[in-house]
From Swiss-Prot:
May bind 1 zinc ion per subunit. Its cofactor is Zn(2+). This is Protein translocase subunit SecA. Zn(2+) binds at residues 890, 892, 901-902. The gene is secA. It is found in: Cell inner membrane; Cytoplasm. The keyword NAD does not apply.
Length: 906
């Protein structure tokens, strides 16, 4: 009996089919306008932009303008590049405009498709950000698609790694801005460390289209963007800890490959304790005493560095530095560093220069950065497998865009061998057969090491005409990948290296023109050469088609089906024939970790001989099931991490909004008065609690605290002896005295200098306390997981305690700002040369490090501008103290060290 759901789908169509039907109706509207727009001359077509903008100001919406705007871009693309967007590209453009993810097969024209919603949303004048995974793609797309936008009267900018602040500001001011996800995130963080609004470069987060959206919002979701400053140098300590690890044996630790964790056994712990004791670094009797928390952390990092991180797979050593390799793309990520001492442990392991650890100055995850956009959309060739995550976390629906022509690629069943040696013999055999008939081949590997091992095998077998593309040679990446479709081409690539560059059968015409004619000037000769290249590519394509089309060979399955699908999707573009096959062995990581024993037993029962493979759809399904389990686990990890990051994100928003308010304000007196009043109220409530008898009042402590904070000698003890005096009266007298002192100080300076000083103190204090708060949150996050053993929810504990820490930070902020403003003397007016410049931290990728002093530039300048006037010291007047050493006795006469007395607030 047919189920009711099946019957309903047959009668009404699925939700996907209904959505496509609605989009096709819009496509029909756009197509109906085509003839009308073809009749417009270039000037009339360009004037459509001004017309649309005028209609928007008169109340029309971008949704209503969509058919005409898309028709305009389609006609412009035809005139500029002789490329007419297909109907399926119009569908994809509408999905992007409606804040969805367009899953579009490789070679179907995502870059051109994106111009449709980019143009439409840029008409609002609020800026459109097009996000790519690297500088090369950002520059390429800005240059090529920018010609279409320029034809229509829109401006296009591109953010590259080495741009200065002025160039970035200009690029963000354009109608359309192309940039990498890293540059966007770091610019946002730097903007929120600026001293003045004029130093900021971004102008808001209106609409973003994320190319390769799965790579950025899924693969990179757990990686925070961090701007950091160096801490003290501990090179000797890292080297010492590193010497302990080689003497450990497998019985000293346990590795969980599924969870990618490593822990010491009891035997290993005892061994490490003895080593530390001999080296004089063990505090107390046990490694797990509270005093040894930091040492445990460093030892665990050293163990991870040696046993979990593999050279040429997870990182490479280049120019005496550790360079991380992206596990998903195989690309190097220069400048990115592991945090919390792990990178230093790797440097000690490889005996390269150890860079100091860094303190986080500001951070944000891609998850929270991209959720700031009012409108967010994305495009990729593979997103369906992660549809649930896109929906739950980003509220983005994945829509599979139909191909313009039917897919003719043949995806063959996996071949599974007992050992890796047998598998590689079969791969070489298969490569030889396909290579001899001139079929273009792409071989995908999972690491640099494996790509180079395969290359060496091929050389020994007499196959030498091939290109290796991995993190070592990423500079040639785009060109190598672009020509991988030439007949007889054999390319070995790590994972998805070259992603974003189209592999066309016969080769990439545009890439060849750029490469071969880069020095040839415009003219008849160049035009003739271009025609010659086009003719040659056409002939080469026919040869490649005759050889069977593009052949993708995978040497291993990835944990994620999506990465496998990306590799497969390289073949069969735009209706071309092709095939794909995965070669596996029971020694592969995925097979070994997830149930190879069971499969090994099954293969033995089948009597599988050496060099024989088993091929069956059932095995493909079993592997897919294992991959789904891994994907589900990784999704849960990312979702859980986001819950914790959301807590910090809420606090980050408060701090950044407060900073923005301070930067934009011309006069901060009202904010400062509010802070001061809250500090006084807190003081009085602490020492003279409301609704208590005067006998319970600690007026002496209150009097000392007032002197400590405000540099005021007030007779609070005398006031408290007056008959019938209430706490409200004491509060009022303190407030009046502080106000009087403030007014006297304010009269000494011009309003401009005072306002500048107020801003400097507020921003410097906020930034300092926020940095300390981030460290506290990291520490809390690292220990809160253990609360689960006490039947307490770690997330709720984290929320509660992080809120308490945040409240304490805000109280501390009010106290420190109030005290500083009551104690400092301004003796030098700021000059033009001292006006702060934008801080550029462009030296790195995901961990942006400041050079030298870890304070922003304006904070360093401030030390030259705001100083204490040295006179003979009067214990009751801190303005006479001059510079006091941190460990000197405090001049106030308390006999305490300065850093524990008045110096605590200076």
């Amino acid at each position: 009996m047919v189920g009711l759901g099946v019957f309903a789908r047959k009668f009404f169509g699925s939700a996907y089919e209904r959505r496509l039907k609605a989009l096709r109706q819009k496509v029909a509207q756009i197509n109906a306008l085509e003839e009308q727009f073809q009749k417009l001359n270039d000037t009339q077509l360009c004037q459509k932009t001004d017309e649309f903008r005028k209609r928007l100001t008169e109340g029309e919406t971008v949704d209503l303008l969509l058919p005409e705007a898309f028709a305009t871009v389609r006609e412009a693309a035809k005139r500029v590049y002789d490329m007419r967007p297909f109907d399926v590209q119009l569908i994809g453009g509408m999905v992007l405009h409606n804040c969805g993810i367009a899953e579009m097969r490789t070679g179907e024209g995502k870059t051109l498709m994106a111009t449709l919603p980019i143009y439409l949303n840029a008409l609002e004048g609020k800026g459109v950000h097009v996000v790519t995974v690297n500088d090369y793609l950002a520059r390429r797309d800005a240059e090529t698609m920018g010609k279409i936008f320029s034809f229509l009267g829109l401006t296009t900018g591109v953010i590259l790694h080495d741009l200065d602040s002025d160039a970035r500001r200009s690029a963000y001011a354009c109608d359309i801005t192309y940039a990498t996800n890293n540059e966007l995130g770091f610019d946002y963080l730097r903007d929120n460390m600026a001293f003045d609004r004029s130093q900021m470069v971004q102008r808001g987060h209106h609409y973003a289209i994320v190319d390769e959206v799965d790579s950025i919002l899924i693969d990179e979701a757990r990686t925070p963007l961090i701007i950091s400053g160096p801490l003290e140098d501990r090179t000797d300590f890292y080297n010492l800890i590193d010497t302990f690890i080689p003497s450990l044996t497998p019985e000293d630790y346990e590795i969980d490959e599924k969870q990618k964790t490593i822990t010491f056994t009891e035997v290993g712990t005892e061994k490490i304790e003895k080593m530390l004791e001999q080296a004089g670094h063990l505090k107390g009797k046990s490694l797990y005493d509270i005093e040894n928390v930091a040492i445990i952390h460093h030892i665990n990092n050293a163990l991870k560095a040696h046993k979990l991180f593999v050279r040429d797979k997870d990182y490479i050593v280049r120019n005496n530095e550790i360079v991380i390799i992206d596990e998903f793309t195989g690309r190097m990520m220069p400048g990115r560093r592991y945090s919390e001492g792990l990178h230093q442990a790797l440097e000690a392991k490889e005996h390269v220069a150890i860079q100091p650890e860094n303190q986080t100055l500001a951070s944000i995850t891609f998850q929270n950065y991209f959720r700031m956009y009012r409108k967010l959309s994305g495009m990729t060739g593979t997103a369906t497998t992660e549809a649930e995550e896109f929906s739950n976390i980003y509220d983005l629906e994945v829509v599979e865009i139909p191909t313009n022509l039917p897919i003719q690629r043949r995806d063959e069943d996996d071949e599974i061998y007992r050992t890796a040696e047998e598998k590689y013999r079969a791969i070489v055999r298969d490569i030889r057969q396909a290579h001899e008939k001139g079929q273009p081949i792409l071989v995908g590997t999972t690491s640099i090491e494996k790509s180079e091992q395969l290359a060496e095998r091929l050389r020994k077998e007499g196959i030498t005409d091939f290109r290796v593309l991995n993190a070592r040679y990423h500079e040639q990446e785009a060109y190598i990948i672009a020509q991988a479709g030439v007949p007889g081409a054999l390319t070995i690539a790590t994972n998805m290296a070259g992603r974003g560059t189209d592999i066309q059968l016969g080769g990439n015409v545009e890439m060849r023109i750029r490469q071969e004619l880069q020095d040839m000037p415009e003219g008849i000769e160049r035009t003739a050469k271009i025609e010659e290249i086009k003719k040659d590519v056409k002939q080469l394509k026919e040869k490649a088609l005759a050889a069977g089309g593009f052949y993708v060979i995978a040497t291993e399955r990835h944990e994620s089906r999506r990465i496998d699908n990306q590799l497969r999707g390289r073949s069969g573009r735009q209706g071309d024939p092709g095939r794909s096959k995965f070669f596996l062995s029971l020694q592969d990581d995925l097979m070994r970790i997830f149930g190879s024993n069971r499969m090994d037993g099954m293969l033995q029962k089948l009597g599988l001989k050496e060099n024989e493979a088993i091929t069956h759809p059932w095995i493909n399904k079993a592997l897919e099931k294992a991959q789904k389990k891994v994907e589900a686990r990784n999704f849960e990890i990312r979702k859980n991490l986001l819950k914790y990051d959301d807590v910090m994100n809420d606090q980050r928003k408060v701090i950044f909004e407060q900073r923005m308010e301070i930067m934009n304000a011309d006069d901060l007196i009202e904010m400062i008065l509010e802070m001061r009043n809250e500090v006084i109220e807190d003081l009085v409530e602490t020492y003279i609690p409301s609704e208590t008898y005067s006998e319970k009042w600690d007026v002496k402590a209150l009097q000392e605290e007032i002197h400590h904070l405000f540099n005021l000698e007030l007779p609070v003890e005398e006031w408290a002896k007056e008959d019938g005096i209430a706490e409200e009266q004491i509060l009022e007298r303190i407030s009046n005295a502080v106000t009087k002192l403030e007014n006297e100080r304010a009269e000494r300076y011009s309003p401009e200098i005072l306002a500048y000083f107020h801003k400097a103190v507020l921003l410097e204090t906020i930034d300092t306390l926020w940095r300390e708060h981030l460290v506290n949150l990291d520490h809390l996050r690292s220990v809160v997981g253990f609360r689960g053993y006490a039947q307490r929810d770690p997330l709720n504990e984290y929320k509660t305690e992080s809120f308490e820490l945040f409240q304490a930070m805000l109280r501390n902020l009010r106290r420190i700002v109030t005290s500083k403003l009551m104690r400092f003397e301004i003796i030098q007016q700021p000059t033009e040369s001292l006006i702060p410049e934008q801080v550029d931290g462009n030296d790195s990728a995901l961990n942006d490090q400041r050079k030298g002093n870890d304070s922003p530039l304006w904070m360093q300048i401030q030390e030259n501008r705001v100083v204490v006037n040295p006179k003979d010291r009067n214990p009751k007047d801190s303005t006479t103290w001059g510079k006091v050493g941190r460990n000197e006795r405090c001049p106030c006469g308390s006999e305490k060290k300065y850093k524990h007395c008045h110096g605590a607030f200076v």
